[in-house]
């Protein structure tokens, strides 16, 4: 006897998420607002593919067998390594380099899309997420960096985040690079250790100085004690080197007095550029409550070469466990003068900012700044008779409603009237259209106000109040279908506006 074939188990891969209609609409609404600010600043839309040659991504080059962890990669028929993009910046650099001669300089563009990280997933940490970037390529001066910070502040306020609930923090990687040079971590041979330092400093808010000091030194067990949890290898700095790094990246640090960096040219250049950015944003009317200079901002990617930015939400909102916490970063960016230059062999200055779309959407929903109250479920035409003539008549009703701009559908399942009304209720449909044999013979139909009907059932117990309420169901001539539905929808909208 043949074995029964096993059913394939339906399961979502770890680190990925399905998206609901509500979330999709919320993201589209939020992104339309962000896009309007980018457009206001004169940026143009652009788009690049999800897949790039791995060497074009720059940070995760293939080894003998496969690319390093961090990206999803595969080989094509020509045995060339391809990877899903891990951000939008590296593909932008490739595009600009490939089309450099025909693009206007400065090239000001924005783009949005999915990016992928082959990293360990966790709560709120996904392997696929959406970013929304803006970039200026071809401008060497820090005026472009100052503009990025100002544009991000304007984005926050356009989304309804009031002053005091956000801040754009600005630093300069040259400050930290100068410190690293001074303590002996300059040069190509120390790229790996520098990246470990950057990622350690990027965790200051989460781990605090002592936790970061372990990552700067021998390493850290994430369980809090030796042998507990996973071990993260440190940068191998000695105590003096680690202290110099922590001193230079303290949130309120000013120009360091320590002689270890006092004469370092890279450090001094970074400090000077920060002073220029601060002067520019203040002259434009952006106070410290909106854009603040902050030495703790480093960003975790190696390719940043100058000013770096981070958009932080200061508002306290519930986390996944219901605890009230400061939400933190929702985006960041900086100057990446070396990315385009890799392809062209000549200096090409560039700066940009990336918004974490999913994270920002979560924050806005928690703050009550994003909802879909203006999205109304469709009017549903119930199917009482299933012969071809009746189906054609129901379809005609739907067509009339759609022609009038009313979102609507004909029920296409196989259930009876009771189940159809239950379907309409689960969809949140505002109105149901009903026409059986008796109504058809009279040229009439019933229009059921599902919102008012639900309210009356839940709230009204007094007969007098019931009679005084708006009718939850009316019978009208077929010719009055559109007018009556519009009337009901308008009444529902008025009640929503009153907060009823």
Swiss-Prot record:
Keywords linked to the UniProt accession: Aminoacyl-tRNA synthetase, ATP-binding, Cytoplasm, Ligase, Nucleotide-binding, Protein biosynthesis
Location within or outside the cell: Cytoplasm
Instruction: Provide a Gene Ontology MF annotation, just one.
Output: histidine-tRNA ligase activity
Name the PROSITE patterns for this protein. AA_TRNA_LIGASE_II
Cite the InterPro entries for this sequence.
aa-tRNA-synth_II, aa-tRNA-synth_II/BPL/LPL, Anticodon-bd, Anticodon-bd_dom_sf, His-tRNA-ligase, HisRS-like_core, HisRS/HisZ, HisRS_anticodon
Against Pfam families, the record matches this protein to: HGTP_anticodon, tRNA-synt_His
Q: Which enzyme class, named as a word?
A: ligase
GO BP of this protein: histidyl-tRNA aminoacylation
Where it mainly occurs, coarsely classed, is: cytoplasm
Q: What EC identifiers does the entry list? A: 6.1.1.21
GO CC annotation, single: cytoplasm
What is this enzyme's catalytic activity, as reactions? tRNA(His) + L-histidine + ATP = L-histidyl-tRNA(His) + AMP + diphosphate + H(+)
Q: Which family does the entry's similarity section mention?
A: Belongs to the class-II aminoacyl-tRNA synthetase family.
Question: Could you give the subunit structure recorded for this chain?
Answer: Homodimer.
- Could you identify this protein by its name? Histidine--tRNA ligase
Q: Which gene encodes it?
A: hisS
